[in-house]
Amino acid sequence: MKVLQEMTAVRLLQLKAIKFQPKNPFTWGNGWTSPMYCDDRKILSYPKMRDFIRLELARVIAEMYPDADIVAGVATNAIAHGVLVAEQLSLPFIYVHPQPKDHGLENQIEGDLRPRQSVVVVENQVNTGVNLAKVIEAIRNNGCKVLGVVTIFDYGFSATKRKLEKMDVSLTPLTNFETVLRHASAMGVIDEEQKETIENWQQNPAKWEK
């Protein structure tokens, strides 16, 4: 996995899918300020990178979860990657909202999921894990087993790690915060002062101030 983590980190940085702005931080949807941002949606615009992610996520699932019956994407950002991976593995696909919709059929799970199926969840990136936890719970409430979660990038927040461990769910990222930051520094994308700032943020993102 280490070689894969290194390769994925370098490719994401070359694609400029991960941006760093310690002095002009981004605002996340949950209100946190962050000196970095993973724009993994850019991957979909570049066929070679898109194929790389598709093949590697599929390979991880095939090796770690050979008994998977179905692939579930976390709505909405992981739907595209989930579909690509399911197609590669010739597996059925569903996607799951963090909450049931308030219109139409009011579904939380979109597609056909039968009780007792074994599910692998595809997430585009893992940060707080709040929505991911809701998706896992919804799948389990449908009488199914969550084999594990695969993702492109993991921020590695300690609170998220504890949350997934408590839920007894394994997480396998193609790359992670430490690997990306190390390569960003080596490639001259960030300097040492910026690297230290970003590391401090990652230790306590909810209370970080620039």
Which residues does each PLM region occupy?
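PRPP-dependent phosphoribosyltransferase catalytic core
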Residues: 2-15, 137-210
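Phosphate/pyrophosphate-binding loops at sites that engage ATP/ADP/AMP, CoA/4′-phosphopantetheine
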Residues: 57-69, 136-142
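Solvent-exposed alpha-helices and their adjacent loops that cap or buttress functional pockets
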Residues: 64, 111-115, 163
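Short glycine-rich phosphate-binding loop at a beta-alpha junction
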Residues: 66-75, 150
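Short, glycine/charge-rich flexible loops or terminal/linker lids adjacent to PRPP-binding catalytic cores
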Residues: 81-120, 128-134, 187
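Active-site-facing substrate-recognition patch
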Residues: 1-64
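Conserved acidic residues
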Residues: 69, 117, 147
